Swiss-Prot record:
GTP binds at residues 467-474, 517-521, 571-574. The lineage of its organism: Bacteria, Bacillati, Actinomycetota, Actinomycetes, Propionibacteriales. Keywords: Cytoplasm, GTP-binding, Initiation factor, Nucleotide-binding, Protein biosynthesis. Residues 467-474 are annotated as: G1. This is Translation initiation factor IF-2. Residues 252-261, 284-334 have a biased composition (Gly residues). Its main location: cytoplasm. NCBIfam families: IF-2 (TIGR00487), small_GTP (TIGR00231). It is found in: Cytoplasm. Residues 335-346 have a biased composition (Basic residues). It holds the Pfam family IF-2. Residues 517-520 are annotated as: G3. Residues 458-629 form the tr-type G domain. GO terms for cellular component: cytosol.
Length: 964
């Protein structure tokens, strides 16, 4: 509802704008002009004050007003339509009113409201009350059906219409603010909205009535809208009439169900104004009237359904169940619905609904199902498998103490912990199974020969030479091949895997044997494992002078794990200290029993230097292959094999040393090797000769790949380059995720808090570049095993094969990393850029040199540990005062040396009084830097002067302690 302006209200109340402004100022309300608007509470107070102060006359009684009469009387006229429905009647007759209105009267009609405009019955639906309109006289209550229907033309004000006399003995009712009338039952339909009369000029508002159209909970808003309520009529005697007027209940007795369903009393139910306008309180409690509506204003009691009063028509309402009234601008409406929740309850329910759950979010848990995930899978991959949201899984892991993003690769242990929390069995697919599933999606298969037995032909055996470092493996192969590979190896040790083919004559037949040379250093464990998996027979080389060494046992275990037969070559028998029988006895403890001892393992004594026993070794290899193995393959199928080594050649690009296991590789074939793919441009055998094809068990160097494959990657020939590229890209994505999950050292919340307490952790970042993929892999694995404590961390941020490029230098400059070059050098532009950016590049040709220097660098990054070292002691024998330097201690040096600016502590009676330092030191009149034992001196302490005779000054220094 719009706000009322001053001049409109003045016109309505019959005052001038100036008078109304004065009254507003007297009330303490500041209003600027007559065009200003007034808030609804001020309008209400103003109307109450003017209504109680001004006398009522006949002219004002004819004007429409919002106040109700406090007298209850039996109406003989019907209510006419107004802009707002009249309040429903409440039972109980009122006292007899006087014919003329008197100001301040408690029983007569009020000013501004004609007593003839009141009825004793509940208003009918559709009828709209018009204040000041002449009410037609109604027949007696015994004949309610003869009551005429009002017409629009009857809405003419009749100020002096006599009010009918009420029934004697009926008590008057007190007004109840906010009461809303129910529609009169049995009445005709209301006028259309266009035909409804507007507000009467000069009409005042009802005292205490809520403003219509301002109730947010009302089903209908606006002035003059009627509500269809249940029918209620007067009760005459014991009879009830459906559409007639009901007689008020005599004697003020309680109406039916007077107290049932009533709301709890609250301050809104109390009368707003205690003035002469308020009539007498009822002596009894009436029932709730008006059906669903309110039967009228309440009296001083709280029963509800009271009749009469200044805000309701005279007469009793139906003593039945009432509904809630419409809430106005100030105060609550009628009785609330049953089960209505308080604001506190609603707030509590809302808080409980929004409160976080203890222990994590709600995620659908499984029933122990098995979920297969690839290695390095993310939480998004797991969420797709179990039909959950990735954000929920992130929250679950956070509650478990792990901080992981939705797309970050997760380690296997973390996935298993998360699966156990959600009641799922997480099964991490092995790389072999994952690669098999990938190839099956392209209708490919690796590892099986195609065709039947008639398509299989004999192939040479593949022999891997294994053993401890410096036991003569490469020298033995040089003797077999009549070459000198050892001379070209840095440090005299093999740091790359190599493949060669040797021709030998066995039983007057030329036989080919393929040898694979593996490194013996402990850093090349992965290479030895790959060599054992790619071989048919393992030759275990043991030096006769050293015996069984750690890498000998490791190579033995690799061969047993690959389930390949083993031939033992006892080397260096030409040395005087050689003891082949000792070697046989040691290997017997590991399950290798010689044939001469009743076992099944062939032992051959050889000397790579004198070529003694080489033919016996070749014969033993061939006999073992023929006796224990079925060495056949299909040469007509698409080639498949393994890349045992790979490197980046400056002139030829990526070069892979491949061992053909089945099929025949031709120039022009589309191949995919790990995450690399390409077309075979050229093939070179172990003698350096170009070949057009490679048969099974033949080692060749393959050129034409787009990148350097990983050492040990399987390769196979596919139909076209497109399929090869798709397989390579999928493998690369899988390897990247697995590498991230493996290399990322994720901290838990507890570890993070501990780190924050201790301070930042020093970290050494490395970029590894090598000449071969196997060498880089071996170097990275060896560096990962370095452990110097929790204060320093080592992390490899990039790795690659080939020369050091400008990209590597840029990354190192941006991340403050160190570049490690293993048998490689930077390009000219990269070297110039490294000099400009002050990037540190370290070059190594032997792997253990790199490991030792990097470990030393890590130890140098450790925070130093200091320990206290005593320097000397001085005894204070006399104290001097000086205005320049303060208190001077005259001392005798009793032990060691006292130096100026050295740390010192003042000790009194064996108790440390102060930690300070020597500020000044003087002997006689000369300032000195130190004073030795047996001499006197004068000294002052920094920021301390409370010294006594007999105190000791102990001088010391902090010396760095070397870290282990």
């Amino acid at each position: 509802m719009a706000k009322v302006r001053v001049y409109e209200l003045a016109k309505e109340l019959g005052l001038s704008s100036k008078q109304l402004l004065g009254k507003l100022n007297d009330m303490g309300e500041f209003v600027r002009s007559a065009s200003s608007t007034i808030e609804a509470p001020v309008v209400r107070r103003l109307r109450d004050q003017i209504g109680s102060a001004e006398p009522a006359d006949d002219a004002k009684a004819a004007k429409p007003a919002a106040r109700k009469s406090q007298t209850s009387s039996k109406k003989t006229s019907k209510e006419t339509t107004t802009a707002k429905p009249a309040p429903g009647p409440k039972p109980g007759p009122g006292p007899k009113p006087t014919p003329g209105p008197r100001p301040g009267s408690s029983s007569g009609p009020k000013p501004g409201r004609s007593s003839a405009a009141r009825t004793s019955a509940t208003p009918r639906p559709g009828l709209i009350k018009s204040s000041g309109a002449s009410s037609q006289q109604e027949p007696p209550a015994a004949k309610p059906e003869s009551k005429p229907t009002p017409k629009p033309g009857q809405n003419v004000p009749k100020p002096h219409a006599p009010a009918p006399k009420p029934k004697p003995g009926a008590p008057s009712k007190s007004p109840k603010p906010g009461a809303r009338p129910g529609p009169r039952p049995g009445g005709s339909a209301g006028l259309p909205s266009a035909a409804r009369p507007g507000p009467r000029p000069g009409a005042g508002r009802r005292t205490g009535a809520p403003r219509p159209g301002n109730n947010p909970f009302a089903s209908s808003q606006g002035m003059g809208q009627s509500r269809h309520r249940s029918e209620g009529g007067q009760r005459s005697g014991g009879s009830r009439s459906g559409q007639g007027e009901r007689m008020p209940r005599p004697g003020g007795s309680q109406g039916s169900r007077g107290g049932s369903g009533m709301p709890r009393p609250n301050p809104a139910m109390m009368p707003k104004h205690q003035s002469s306008q308020i009539g007498q309180a009822t002596t009894g409690r009436g029932g709730r009237g008006g059906g669903r509506g309110r039967g009228g204003s309440r009296g001083s009691g709280f029963g509800g359904g009271f009749g009469g009063g200044p805000r309701g028509p005279i007469g009793g309402g139906r003593g039945g169940r009432g509904g809630r009234g419409t809430q106005g601008a100030f105060g609550r409406g009628g009785g609330g619905r049953r089960g209505r929740k308080s604001r506190k309850q609603r707030r509590q329910e809302f808080d409980e609904m929004q409160a976080p759950l203890v222990g994590g979010v709600r995620v659908r848990k499984g029933n122990g199902e098995t979920v297969r995930l690839r290695r390095g899978a993310s939480l998004t991959d797991l969420a797709e498998k179990i039909n959950a949201e990735p954000a929920q899984l992130v929250q679950v892991l956070f509650n478990l103490g792990e901080m992981v993003t939705a797309t970050q690769s997760v380690s296997d242990d973390t996935l298993e912990i998360l699966g156990g929390e959600l009641n799922y069995q997480i099964q991490v697919v092995s790389p072999e199974d994952e690669d098999r599933e990938l190839l099956e999606s392209f209708d490919l298969e690796f590892g099986e020969d195609e065709g039947d037995d008639s398509d299989l032909v004999a192939r040479p055996p593949v022999v891997t030479v294994m053993g401890h470092v410096d036991h003569g493996k490469t020298k033995l192969l040089d003797a077999l091949r009549h070459t000198d590979v050892v001379k070209g190896e840095a440090g005299g040790i093999t740091q790359a895997i190599g493949a060669y083919q040797v021709q030998t004559e066995v039983d007057d037949a030329e036989r080919a044997i393929t040898f694979i040379d593996t490194p013996g250093h402990e850093a090349f464990t992965a290479m030895r494992a790959r060599g054992a998996q790619s071989t048919d027979i393992a030759v275990l080389v043991v030096a006769a002078d050293d015996g069984v060494m750690p890498q000998t046992v490791e190579a033995l275990n690799h061969a047993k794990a690959a389930d390949v037969p083993i031939v033992v070559a006892v080397n260096k028998i030409d040395k005087p200290e050689a003891d082949p029988d000792k070697v046989r006895g040691q290997l017997t403890e590991y399950g290798l029993v010689p044939e001469e001892y009743g076992g099944d393992t062939m032992f051959v004594n050889v000397s790579a230097r004198t070529h003694e026993g080489l033919d016996d070794l070749l014969e033993a290899i061939v006999l073992t292959a023929d006796a224990a193995l079925d060495l056949r393959a299909n040469p007509d199928m698409a080639a498949q094999g393994v890349a045992i080594e790979a490197h980046l050649d400056k002139g030829r690009g990526p070069v892979a040393t491949a061992l053909i296991q089945r099929g025949t590789l031709h120039i022009g074939d589309s191949i995919v090797a790990g995450s690399s793919y390409g077309r075979v441009r050229a093939m070179i055998n172990d003698q350096g000769e170009s070949v057009d094809e490679a048969a099974p068990a033949t080692p060749v160097q393959v050129l034409g790949l787009t990148s350097v494959p990983g050492a040990g990657d399987n390769f196979l020939v596919v139909d076209d380059d497109r399929k090869a590229r798709q397989i390579a890209e999928k493998r690369e994505a899988r390897m990247r995720a697995a590498q991230q999950a493996r290399s990322s050292r994720r901290k838990t919340l507890d570890q993070l808090f501990e780190q924050l307490e201790k301070g930042e952790t020093e970290e050494l970042l490395l970029i590894l570049k090598g000449d071969g993929a196997g060498s880089v892999e071996a170097l990275e694995d060896a560096l990962a095993k370095i452990d110097v404590g929790d204060e320093v961390d080592l992390r490899v941020i990039d790795r690659g094969v080939g020369a050091i490029t400008e990209t590597n230098v840029s990354l190192a400059a941006a991340s403050n990393a160190v570049i490690v070059g293993f048998n490689v050098r930077p390009t000219a532009h990269a070297q110039r850029m490294a000099d400009e950016e002050n990037v540190d590049i370290r070059y190594y040709s032997v792997i253990y040199d790199a490991i030792d220097e990097i470990e030393a660098a890590l130890r140098g990054m450790l925070k130093p540990i200091y320990e206290e070292k005593a320097m000397g002691t001085a005894e204070i024998r006399q104290i001097f005062r000086s205005s320049k330097v303060g208190t001077i201690a005259g001392c005798m040096i009793t032990d060691g040396t006292i130096r100026r600016h050295a740390k010192a502590r003042l000790v009194r009676d064996g108790v440390v009084v102060q930690e300070t330092e020597i500020n000044t030191l003087q002997r006689e009149k000369d300032a000195v830097t130190e004073v030795r034992e047996g001499y006197e001196c004068g000294l002052t302490l920094t920021n301390y002067s409370d010294i006594h005779v007999g105190d000791e000054v102990q001088c010391y220094e902090m010396v760095e302690k070397p870290r282990d």
